[in-house]
Amino acid sequence: MIIKNIIFDFGGVLMDWNPKYLYQNVFNTDEEMNYFLDHIATLKWNAEQDRGRSFQEATEILQNQYPEFSKEIALYYSQWPVMLKGTIEENVNILRNLHGRYQLYGLTNWSAESFPYAYQNYDFFSLFNGIVVSGEEKLIKPDERIYQLLLNRYNLNASECLFIDDNYENIRAAQAMDFNTIHVGSETNLQEELQKFNI
């Protein structure tokens, strides 16, 4: 097995994104914040924006359902950059070290409306040979079609690719398509995991 291409997810692997970074300054208690994020402005709701739904439509839908939280819902996208704390520096350093030795690609579930902010504000994105953004394609992981789109667009062979993601469902989908994979958890040392692939 020869790895030629390394494919990175962004959130949870290279970037520290969490809605709590915004809402911990909005709600008085963690209990209120967690209720809002677990039951109202949920990750499932946000995933539809990653799939291509507009921020305006998503906000209006939720405000109509929960008018008592109208102000807090509006903040989700108007103050979105606050959720992006910054890079996961040790992994970004690994990415920089891989540049020039491997073909590097990004495969991310990210809204087409907010991804440009990150792309313009973090220089490491320029290291990638190509990036597939779910919101631009109207497809999200773990749908196998977005993995196939990546392979087709950049003429890649899955068995020569190493896919790195923090979501196990996304990892399972990639494995089913013959990608090599690394699942990044809270205790994962990415450098050690790469060494298992002689990288």
Regions found by a protein language model. Give the residues of each.
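Asp-based, Mg2+/Mn2+-dependent phosphohydrolase catalytic module
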Residues: 1-4, 111-112, 119-199
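Alpha-helical structural context
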Residues: 25-26, 65, 101, 121, ...
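A generic structural motif
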Residues: 101-103, 179
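N-terminal helical cap/lid subdomain that shapes the substrate entry/recognition surface
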Residues: 2-89, 93, 100, 111-114
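Generic structural signal for small/hydrophobic residues in well-ordered secondary structure
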Residues: 9-12, 52, 98, 106, ...
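A structural alpha-helix within SAM-dependent methyltransferase catalytic domains
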Residues: 96-99, 151
